[in-house]
Amino acid sequence: MIIVTNTAKITKGNGHKLIERFNKVGKVETMPGFLGLEVLLTQNTVDYDEVTISTRWNAKEDFQGWTKSAAFKDAHSHQGGMPEYILDNKIAYYDVKVVRMPMAAAQ
């Protein structure tokens, strides 16, 4: 399993604009190997908002299949370029080495 994060630096007070874009079912949910998505808002930033989109995939090839799909291109086609509220972004890839799940409570 891999996790891919896209961390965006957003003009202060506008993080909700990016978050709202992910608060609906999209086409990524239908992609082979897609395991889930979380949208994270960093707490206590002073000068800007920071939003991280974290996606989980069975394999890097599955993520690459998403980025090459027509659905990805459609979802990321910004008329006139990147939205003005996004100041910067960084993509990172993580190999998941350990996963721990909650244990059932003792009866």
Curated annotation (Swiss-Prot):
It is an enzyme of class 1 (oxidoreductase). Keywords: Cytoplasm, Heme, Iron, Metal-binding, Monooxygenase, Oxidoreductase. The keyword Lyase does not apply. Its EC number is 1.14.14.18. GO terms for molecular function: heme binding; heme oxygenase (decyclizing) activity; iron ion binding. The record marks 66 as: Transition state stabilizer. InterPro entries: ABM_dom, Dimeric_a/b-barrel, Heme-degrading_MO, IsdG. The keyword Flavoprotein does not apply. One of its GO terms (biological process) is heme catabolic process. Disulfide bonds: none annotated. Its main location: cytoplasm. It holds the Pfam family ABM. Residues 2-94 form the ABM domain. Fe cation binds at residue 6. Allows bacterial pathogens to use the host heme as an iron source. Catalyzes the oxidative degradation of the heme macrocyclic porphyrin ring to the biliverdin in the presence of a suitable electron donor such as ascorbate or NADPH--cytochrome P450 reductase, with subsequent release of free iron. PANTHER family: HEME OXYGENASE (STAPHYLOBILIN-PRODUCING) 1, SIGNAL TRANSDUCTION PROTEIN TRAP. This is Heme-degrading monooxygenase.
